[in-house]
């Protein structure tokens, strides 16, 4: 497959990562054969260096460096929370118009890779959110005759593992399609009614200062077909959120 390249200069390159694709090889997923890092390397015939990650089921802007020095410089920006990130999510229910989630999250240890590690104290985790649109659909997923969803812009100010997914669960507005932190019954009903079967979380935008040129860079990624399908069914207009 060929990846959609969103931005490229002499030292950085960004793609629109498809949902379901791992960023790089992992011994925990030995059966996988398709990875964003290796696919991009083969596509541009040049080695690329990882800077940050997106969860496997998350789509959107994924940035790589084209040399190790740039990878180090950009990684420092991410670690120092100097990179602005914005995600789109579709969540269950009507969420408040906007707010800040300041809820510490425990470090998630892998059962195999971290089997000898000791549990760690919860770390600070902060996410800002804004409700962009709401919809009430004429089908039941529980005790009510209708089902409500919200389109939310999420801006994490820290970078904890699964932060957005865990914070939405904490608010009792889980992200639709989330098989780990979401409502499995609601997920199944959404698939039955709409045909959508992915995590509805998309890394829409990255904004940062280029370490070498000092230019302000903004990179945005369009939504895939399943997102566009839901927008159509929910009566949301694509151009209202991408400009």
UniProtKB/Swiss-Prot annotation:
Catalytic activity: uridine(65) in tRNA = pseudouridine(65) in tRNA
Major enzyme class: isomerase
One Gene Ontology biological process: enzyme-directed rRNA pseudouridine synthesis
Keyword Isomerase: yes
CDD domains registered for this protein in UniProt: PseudoU_synth_TruC (cd02563)
List of catalytic residues: 55
InterPro entries with a match to the protein in the record: PsdUridine_synth_cat_dom_sf, PsdUridine_synth_RluA-like_CS, PsdUridine_synth_RsuA/RluA, RluA_PseudoU_synthase
Keyword S-adenosyl-L-methionine annotated: no
Enzyme Commission number(s) from the entry: 5.4.99.26
UniProt keyword terms in alphabetical order: Isomerase, tRNA processing
GO molecular function: RNA binding; tRNA pseudouridine(65) synthase activity
Protein family membership: Belongs to the pseudouridine synthase RluA family.
NCBIfam families the UniProt entry points to: PRK11112.1
Primary role: Responsible for synthesis of pseudouridine from uracil-65 in transfer RNAs.
Protein name, entry field: tRNA pseudouridine synthase C
Organism: Haemophilus ducreyi (strain 35000HP / ATCC 700724)
Source species taxonomy: Bacteria, Pseudomonadati, Pseudomonadota, Gammaproteobacteria, Pasteurellales
Annotated gene: truC
